[in-house]
C-alpha cells in the first residue's frame, strides 16, 4: 500500500495530534495521504489503497459504508472506549501499523453487510446498507410496535416489542448483544433477528442463513410512530403499509487486520473493559 485516506472524528480528544503523527509516519516511508474530518468523498482520489479512521467504532462503520461499493479496505485506530472493530488502540501503535500496511503484511477480513429496502405501495422507496444492524423502532410515540416477520415468504411470528433488530455477525456484539442476542463469529454468513424488550417470554433471537430474505410488515396503525435505522446514524420514516425487505448485500466491508488473532481473545479483552 502506498496511498492512504485518513478520516478523523473531530469530536474525539487527541485526534488532531494523532492525525499529524500518522501523516508523518506515512510520509517518511514514502507514502501519500489525504485527510478529512467526517464523511468520505473519494471521487477525487480514485487511487486510494486504504482508508484509515481515527475515532471509535462509529467512525469506522460510517466510513466503511461510504466506501464499501469501491472495494477499498479500511482499518481503524481506536480513540474511543471499546473499539470492537478498530485494530489498534490510541496512537501508541501507529508506527507499527504503518510499517505493516506499507510492507503489505496485513490480511483482510471481508464482513457481510445487510441491504434494507423500504417497499412503499409495491415499489422500492429507499435502500440503506448496514454493517452492524438494521433496526425497526418506534419514534415519537412510546407505544409497543407489532411487527409481522416473514422468512422467504413464510410467516415466522408477530412480535409485540419496542422494535426489531436484524443484525450481521459483525453487529452481533453491538445493539444485538445489548438486547440479549447471541454473539456470532464475525466472518460467518448469518443474520440475526432479535426483538427489543418483547412482551412474551417465548420471543427470542433467531439465527438465519444469510441467503434468506426477511420481510417485516406492521400489524398496528400508529401514524408516524416508527422508523428504519441502520448502524445508529441513518434512518427513514416508515408508514403503516410499508414493508421492509432485508437481505445480504452484494457489497461487503473489507476490514484490515494486522495480525491473525482469536475472535474469542478479542471478545474477552473487550468485555473486560466494560
Predicted feature residues:
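Catalytic core of DAGKc-family lipid kinases
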Residues: 82-162
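Proline-centered loop/turn at the N-terminus of a beta-strand
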Residues: 71-73
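Gly/Ser/Thr-rich active-site loops/lids in small-molecule metabolic enzymes
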Residues: 158-161, 166-202
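ATP/nucleoside-binding phosphotransfer catalytic cores, i.e., glycine-rich phosphate-binding loops
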Residues: 136, 141, 152-155, 203-274
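Short glycine-rich anion-binding loops that position phosphate/pyrophosphate groups of nucleotides
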Residues: 57-59, 82, 170-172
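A generic structural signal for short beta-strands and their flanking turns/coil linkers
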Residues: 110-114, 130-132, 143-147, 162-164, ...
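ATP/NTP phosphate-donor binding region
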Residues: 1-50, 54, 90-107, 117-128
Amino acid at each position: 500500500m502506498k496511498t492512504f485516506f485518513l478520516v478523523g472524528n473531530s469530536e474525539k480528544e487527541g485526534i488532531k495530534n494523532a492525525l499529524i503523527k500518522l501523516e508523518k509516519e506515512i510520509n517518511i516511508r514514502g507514502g501519500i495521504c489525504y485527510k478529512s474530518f467526517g464523511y468520505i468523498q473519494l471521487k477525487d482520489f480514485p487511487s486510494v489503497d486504504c482508508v484509515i479512521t481515527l475515532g471509535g467504532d462509529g467512525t469506522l462503520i460510517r466510513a466503511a459504508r461510504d466506501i464499501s461499493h469501491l472495494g477499498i479496505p479500511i482499518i481503524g485506530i481506536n480513540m474511543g472506549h471499546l473499539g470492537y472493530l478498530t485494530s489498534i488502540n490510541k496512537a501508541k501503535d501507529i508506527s507499527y501499523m504503518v510499517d505493516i500496511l506499507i510492507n503489505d503484511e496485513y490480511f483482510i477480513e471481508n464482513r457481510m453487510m445487510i441491504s434494507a429496502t423500504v417497499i412503499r405501495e409495491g415499489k422500492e422507496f429507499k435502500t440503506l446498507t448496514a454493517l452492524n444492524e438494521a433496526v425497526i423502532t418506534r419514534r415519537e410515540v412510546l407505544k409497543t410496535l407489532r411487527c409481522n416477520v416473514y422468512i422467504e415468504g413464510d410467516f415466522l411470528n408477530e412480535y409485540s416489542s419496542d422494535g426489531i433488530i436484524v443484525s450481521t455477525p459483525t453487529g452481533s456484539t453491538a445493539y444485538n448483544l445489548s438486547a440479549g442476542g447471541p454473539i456470532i463469529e464475525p466472518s460467518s454468513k448469518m443474520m440475526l433477528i432479535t426483538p427489543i424488550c418483547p412482551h412474551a417470554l417465548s420471543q427470542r433471537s433467531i439465527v438465519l442463513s444469510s441467503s434468506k430474505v426477511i420481510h417485516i410488515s406492521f400489524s398496528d396503525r400508529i401514524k408516524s410512530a416508527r422508523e428504519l435505522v441502520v448502524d445508529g446514524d441513518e434512518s427513514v420514516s416508515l408508514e403503516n403499509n410499508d414493508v421492509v425487505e432485508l437481505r445480504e448485500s452484494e457489497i461487503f466491508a473489507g476490514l484490515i487486520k494486522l495480525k491473525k488473532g482469536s475472535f474469542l481473545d478479542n471478545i474477552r479483552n473487550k468485555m473486560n473493559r466494560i
